[in-house]
Regions:
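Non-catalytic, mobile gating and regulatory segments of ester bond hydrolases
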Residues: 1-3
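Thiamine diphosphate
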Residues: 5, 91-103, 121, 125-127, ...
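N-terminal capping segment at the start of a domain
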Residues: 8-24, 172-174
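Cofactor-binding active-site loop characterized by glycine-rich and histidine/acidic residues
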Residues: 15-18, 30-161
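Short amphipathic alpha-helical interaction patches enriched in hydrophobic/aromatic residues
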Residues: 19-23, 75, 199-202
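Conserved short-loop catalytic and cofactor-binding motifs
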Residues: 24, 59, 143, 179, ...
Length: 211
């Protein structure tokens, strides 16, 4: 646990360096997801330098694509990006764009940005693994504000229909979106009951507690 905490601290440092260097970005959502991303990349997912370019590994989709400082922060801590790369966030010609681009970074599995599309892509990737007999898992991180998008629920319905038990979604419930509090803009809660209604097995957890 102490090692994970140290990684998470470094990820947060990378987030702040990226946002400061680019003088733009979304630090709030990146910081609220830092521990989840750290846990995924250092404790859960099968992804490392030797398999990052292949298909024989777990895959991650950042559906809330605007929090790239968080994704780049953990990729740098994992060794897929350098500290020098972090300093180029949102600079002209940089591969570290404001939204993730799978054409520029090997460890980025899906280009995202339009909310709701990432989880739909994750469903397709999980279904493809099923059809190919690939036992590796697909993980996706989405936001609670993102759950206002109808495409999220179409994807949830498809995941249940196809029995995608190789798919894991994580919802960052920080209760905030760009227009204000989620409950005030368009209340999506209780999310656990909604996802259970779509056939998901739901686990509620504190996203900042590695225990």
């Amino acid at each position: 646990v102490e090692e994970l905490k140290e990684h998470a601290k470094n990820v947060r440092r990378n987030i702040l360096r990226a946002v400061y260097s680019g003088q733009s970005g979304h630090p709030g959502g990146s910081l609220s997801s830092a521990d989840v991303l750290t846990y995924l990349y250092f404790e859960v997912m099968d992804i490392h330098a030797e398999n990052v370019k292949g298909i024989d590994r777990d895959r991650f989709v950042l559906s809330k694509g605007h929090i790239t400082p968080g994704l780049y922060g953990v990729l740098a801590e994992k060794g897929f990006l350098s500290e020098a790369d972090i300093e180029t966030f949102r600079h002209f010609g940089s591969k570290l764009q404001g939204h993730p681009n799978m054409n520029y970074i090997d460890a980025v599995d899906m280009s995202t940005g339009s909310l709701g599309q990432g989880v739909s892509c994750a469903v397709g990737m999980a279904l493809a693994n099923k059809l190919d007999g690939n036992a590796h898992r697909i993980y996706a991180l989405l936001g609670d504000g993102e759950c206002q998008e109808g495409e999220v629920w179409e994807a949830a319905m498809a995941a249940a229909h196809y029995g995608l038990d190789n798919l894991t979604w994580m919802v960052d419930c920080n209760h905030l979106q760009i227009d204000g509090r989620v409950e005030d803009v368009m209340n999506v809660y209780p999310l656990d009951k909604k996802f259970e209604g779509f056939g998901f097995e739901v686990i509620k957890a504190c996203g900042h507690d590695f225990d």
